[in-house]
Amino acid sequence: MFSRKSVQRLRRRTRSLTKESTQLFCCVVIPDLIDVGGPWKVLPPGIHEASLDEIRMRFGTNRQREELFMGFTRGYRVLRDAGSQQIYLDGSFVTEKPNPEDYDCCWDMAGVDVEKLDPVLLDFSDKRAAQKRKYQGEFFPSSFQAAPCEFFLDYFRKDKYTGQAKGILRVQSAAQDSEVSADQ
């Protein structure tokens, strides 16, 4: 469990690390954001692996972003505990937008025990208002259609302002995510 102070201290210490030096220590590095012509820089095209700790370090940079991260972490844990093996994070939270309003998440339903899911994660009524209230973001099964002939996993990989390809994060599901507490 990391306190806000320890996260800030770690950020200061790791500013001088390069992508190459962190890879020597087997750390995954979220790539630098790129400009695709939209209002904010986004992740480069592709699906980029990241742990909860890495996501928090990179994108939990202010109070608003920290609250969104904690909401995502709560939803992520419900999905993981229900058996989802693939959970993806997208939205303005993973851009350079200073104060994003929410995040978008899609998840693979394969192997999920629906009985273990919070029913709110399957409530898409009223523009997903219940999800936003409880988790500060939106959760979509990746196999659902976001648009005609386009599933959420593919839909999230396009910039909504320009239509250009962009990246998303696949959250690593392993023991390392137990270090981040959703109760902070």
Give the predicted meaning of each segment.
Residues 2, 14-88, 94-101, 109-184:
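Catalytic core of pol beta-like nucleotidyltransferases
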Residues 6-9, 24:
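Cationic, low-complexity basic patches in intrinsically disordered or flexible, solvent-exposed regions
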